[in-house]
C-alpha cells in the first residue's frame, strides 16, 4: 500500500556473514563502538560518584579528575581560539548583520556541580587524544557519546522525581550501566559513508567497499548507515532519502534485504 512519508525515507539492508571480506572490518567497528560507549559512561560515572560521595576518592575517580585537571587549560585554549576565529569572521560582515559572539570557557566539575556535559567531555577527549574516541570517525564517536548522555539525562530526571515521589518507584533509579556484550551498533553519517557509481558503499578507515548493486539503488540521497551486530552477523542498513512523494510500504512491513 502507499503511505504518506514527508521525509521519504527508504531503508535497505545487507546481511554480512562470516567469510565476507568486510566481516572483520564491521566486527572491529562494532567492538570499538562498545568501547566508546563504555569509556564515555566511565568518565561520567567517575566524576558523578566521586563528587557526590562523602568518603575519600577511589583510585579510578581520582584518575579521571586528574585527567580533567591536566587538560582543562588545553580545552579552554581551543575554546578561545575558536572564539577568536568566529569574532574575526563576524567583523567581516556589515555592522548591522554582525552577531554577538560569546566565549564559553570550561570549568572543572566540583561538589556543587558534580557533572560533565557532552561538550565538556568531547573537548576533553580531543585534548587527551583519547584512544577510543580516535578509533572511530569523529561523528561516530560523538553520536555514541550523545546516546550515553541521553541515558544519564533520563537517570537524573528519574532520580529527581524519585526524591519527590518515591512511592512511584519500586526502588531508587540505578546509575546507567556499562555494555557487557562485546559489540554495539554504530551509526555513520553521509559524510563518513559515500555511495559511488550507485553501486559501491565506501566506509571510513578502510579501502574496502561494499557492493550494494544488488539492492537496486538508483536514486535518492544517502542519509545515514547503521551497522547492527546480530546473531554473529552484521546488518548494514542504508537510510535513503528518496525523491518520490510517496513511499510504497509492504503490508508485512519488511525491509528490502539481501544476504552476502
Task: Enumerate the predicted regions with their spans.
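Nucleic-acid substrate recognition interfaces
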Residues: 1-260
